[in-house]
Amino acid sequence: MTTAIMPGCESFSATNGPLGVLVLHGFSGNPASMRSLAESIADAGYSVELPRLPGHGTTLEDMMTTTWADWSRTAEEAFDSLSERCDRVGVVGLSMGGGLSAHIAEVRPRVSACVLINPIVKPPGEEMIEGLTALLDAGVETIDAIGSDIKKEGAIEASYDATPLECVASLFEAMIDVNANLGTITAPTLLLSSREDHVVTSDNGDDVVSMVKGPVERVWLENSYHVATMDNDLELVESATIEFLDRILKS
């Protein structure tokens, strides 16, 4: 039986011409958090794919059956689909979607531009890994939810009410390779960093700046928390993203 998708959390697709953009949502989130940005990119004339990653936008139990292998495969397939019908393709991602975007730029040389929004691109420190391992060894399956880190009053992210630890472990393990290969990314990259982020530490963005081989532009978001695509700086996120994509993909 197919697991029902939460209302408003469906994938989004738009076909507008020979320039494409893949948009990727974050861990335990869903396309709803990226819908406004994806629609704005489409309105700017781009063909857009915003896939719902496996286990997301459905139920916590559904997510607990998935790993990085499932999420990255879906992202890669969406990029390949865009590449088949577009001359140039960029990737845009929030949080884990930023990590997935970096991963795609590492394994798909056709990536022409990257926009990383509060991305996770490195594993956490030893202390957090030890704590995670201890919880898993003790049979703990979930911890408190990490969604809705949003400064804007009244804004709520549609996400799960708990965080599955096996999925967290899978994400952290994948970040070892993503981080090690940041130096293979040659595509121009726009990094959007919230000054105050309670989910992803700022050293993730610092690694993008110091390790990515191609040119990196960093824009600080002064009035948003982690889910910047639903926060006070949404207008800046959209305008900076589209200006960057126009400058790189249309050149």
Identify the role of each PLM range:
Residues T184-I185, L191-S193, D197:
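Short beta-strand/loop motif that positions the catalytic acidic residue
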Residues T59-R85, G90:
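Catalytic nucleophile-loop/oxyanion-hole region of alpha/beta-hydrolase
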Residues V115-G125:
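Active-site nucleophile loop of the alpha/beta-hydrolase fold
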Residues T3-T59:
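Short, surface-exposed "cap/lid" segments of acyl-processing enzymes
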Residues N223-S251:
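Catalytic active-site module of serine/aspartate enzymes centered on a nucleophile-bearing elbow/loop
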Residues G93-G97, S101:
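Gly/Ala-rich beta-loop-alpha elbow adjacent to hydrolase catalytic centers
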Residues L37, A187, T201-S210:
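Short alpha-helix in the alpha/beta-hydrolase fold that links the catalytic acid
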Residues S47, D206-V227:
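Catalytic histidine neighborhood in serine/cysteine hydrolases
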